[in-house]
Swiss-Prot record:
<dbReference type="InterPro" id="IPR029063">
    <property type="entry name" value="SAM-dependent_MTases_sf"/>
</dbReference>
<dbReference type="InterPro" id="IPR002941">
    <property type="entry name" value="DNA_methylase_N4/N6"/>
</dbReference>
<dbReference type="GO" id="GO:0032259">
    <property type="term" value="P:methylation"/>
</dbReference>
<dbReference type="Pfam" id="PF01555">
    <property type="entry name" value="N6_N4_Mtase"/>
</dbReference>
<dbReference type="GO" id="GO:0009007">
    <property type="term" value="F:site-specific DNA-methyltransferase (adenine-specific) activity"/>
</dbReference>
<keyword id="KW-0808">Transferase</keyword>
<dbReference type="InterPro" id="IPR002052">
    <property type="entry name" value="DNA_methylase_N6_adenine_CS"/>
</dbReference>
<keyword id="KW-0949">S-adenosyl-L-methionine</keyword>
<dbReference type="GO" id="GO:0008170">
    <property type="term" value="F:N-methyltransferase activity"/>
</dbReference>
<keyword id="KW-0680">Restriction system</keyword>
<keyword id="KW-0238">DNA-binding</keyword>
<dbReference type="GO" id="GO:0003677">
    <property type="term" value="F:DNA binding"/>
</dbReference>
<protein>
    <recommendedName>
        <fullName>Type II methyltransferase M2.LlaDCHI</fullName>
        <ecNumber>2.1.1.72</ecNumber>
    </recommendedName>
</protein>
<keyword id="KW-0489">Methyltransferase</keyword>
<dbReference type="GO" id="GO:0009307">
    <property type="term" value="P:DNA restriction-modification system"/>
</dbReference>
<comment type="function">
    <text>A beta subtype methylase, recognizes the double-stranded sequence 5'-GATC-3', methylates A-2 on both strands, and protects the DNA from cleavage by the LlaDCHI endonuclease.</text>
</comment>
<dbReference type="GO" id="GO:0005737">
    <property type="term" value="C:cytoplasm"/>
</dbReference>
Length: 269
């Protein structure tokens, strides 16, 4: 395949849904689109894949216990199907990641254990499991177990002895009063001021992505989000001077991401 076939951002074959100032959004199935990205062209990947809660799961909405139905994209019929889904997208993501690049994957207990196993099965070495401790989690209305107040973010690189991933150790110390940054990050859920462009069920706060991007990339690095949703990764990447590709199969979410990219990020450390 000739290099000039990757004419969008120098790394992408498919015409984008949105392209402006080093930020690209693509309306596509991630499995199909990942095959059209230049191999070993991404410096970092952040993914917030489906949690698969829409199969009888319960949630808190306005103080009421309600069933979870985020859409067909969040439904799965069995554990085997879920794990196969995770192995497939991680396998494709590995192909587009540079030899020294890293991947971050966020999730809850409903999916993160499958993700962790899939990462190792597909040739990754897990560097950290970050615990995001939420200061204002939704209450546990059933009173049958502990309140879910954390999510896990896995950070990994290719399991190759020659791999030399980037970590901005000094900057992370600076953000932590001169002390080593620990793997427990405490902060609030996404602020209302970041949700102005529309509703998404799992929108991540900008401060989480800012820390991730600053810790593991440099200016002008390429960042990929294969489940871009409302576009938080792209918004923060753009503000920090990184190049970005975001993929999503849901056009309604891409509309939100487009609005946010056109306006810019609202948060800064």
């Amino acid at each position: 395949m000739a290099i000039n076939e990757y004419k969008y951002g120098g790394v992408l074959m498919t015409k984008p849904y949105y392209e402006k100032e080093n930020a690209i959004l693509v309306h596509a199935d991630s499995f199909k689109l990942l095959e059209k990205i230049k191999p070993e062209s991404m410096d970092m990947i952040f993914a917030d894949p489906p949690y698969f809660l829409s199969n009888g799961g319960m949630s808190n909405s306005g103080g009421q216990i309600v069933s979870v139905d985020k859409g067909d994209w969040d439904k799965i019929s069995s554990f085997e199907e879920k794990h196969d889904f995770n192995r497939r997208w991680i396998r494709l993501a590995r192909l587009v990641l540079k030899p020294n690049g890293t991947i971050w994957v966020s999730g809850s207990l409903h999916n993160i254990y499958s993700v962790g196993m899939a990462l190792e099965q597909e040739g990754f070495k897990i560097l950290n499991n970050i615990t995001w401790q939420k200061t204002n989690p939704a209450p546990n209305l059933s009173c049958r177990y502990f309140t879910h107040s954390t999510e896990t973010i896995l950070w990994a690189r290719k399991n190759d002895k020659k791999s030399r991933h980037y970590y901005n150790y000094e900057l992370m110390k600076e953000f932590n009063d001169g002390k080593q940054m620990k793997d427990v990050w405490t902060g609030s859920l996404t602020k209302k001021s970041e949700k102005w462009a529309g509703k998404h069920p799992t929108q991540k706060p900008e401060y989480i992505l800012e820390r991730i991007i600053l810790a593991s990339t440099k200016e002008n690095d390429y960042i990929l989000d294969p489940f871009v949703g409302s576009g938080t990764t792209g918004v923060v990447a753009k503000r920090l001077g990184r190049k970005f590709i975001g993929i999503d199969s849901e056009k309604e979410y891409l509309k939100i991401a487009k609005k946010r990219l056109n306006k810019g990020a609202t948060y800064g450390l």
